[in-house]
Amino acid sequence: MTTSFREAVNGLDEASFQALYGRWDPLTPEQISDLLAGCGARWIVAGGRAARVGAPPRDHADIDISIRVADVGLIRAVMRDWHLWEVDDGALKPLLPGVALTPDCEELWVRHDAGQPWRFEFLLDRYSTDDEWVYKRDPRVRLPWQRAVHTVGAVEYLRPELALLFKAKNDRPKDRADLLAARLDRSGRAWLADTLDQLGHDEWARLTRSGETSESDGAATEAAAGATELID
């Protein structure tokens, strides 16, 4: 059976991935806060770090920062001394000064230059509005911003239940590990379970409601949980 490019990339272990695409050494949320201070764009920590707030930590090979696509210009202005690379289904292309963003681009990787590691990535939100966070895979799923984010220290994070919703599609070992480790309040757990049901993720809905785990889930692979992914 022929393996698709997407499957091949997502199947790489962390060492193989970084050997192919370059080394990662992610900044902390606090360092990113210093970097983006005063840029005028709202940015939010997403991904596995958002899913794990309040839970036992794991190693994270990267860090995801969500911004609205309308704010890319503000980001480019404050990061003019950095290199931004568009991600397109496994391919990386530099976003050069003065060149417009590719219309369907959803991710940007960030580093100083080719001799330096990748430091973080921007997830480009094309669906949320000034008033509401909107789930990109089904715009029926939406929440007021005050319900979608919370502040940890001085940094905004996507709430864990929203970060976990994004992870249900791929259900990789690290995604399952994040679900099983998550610390959700009662309303967040109920919202996530109901939304997973609505979107057809029955097993994740069951695990969210019950907190059950099989023996194989419990052995779940915290070791595999830190791998970087290029394709969502």
Regions found by a protein language model. Give the residues of each.
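Compositionally biased terminal segments of proteins
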Residues: 1-232
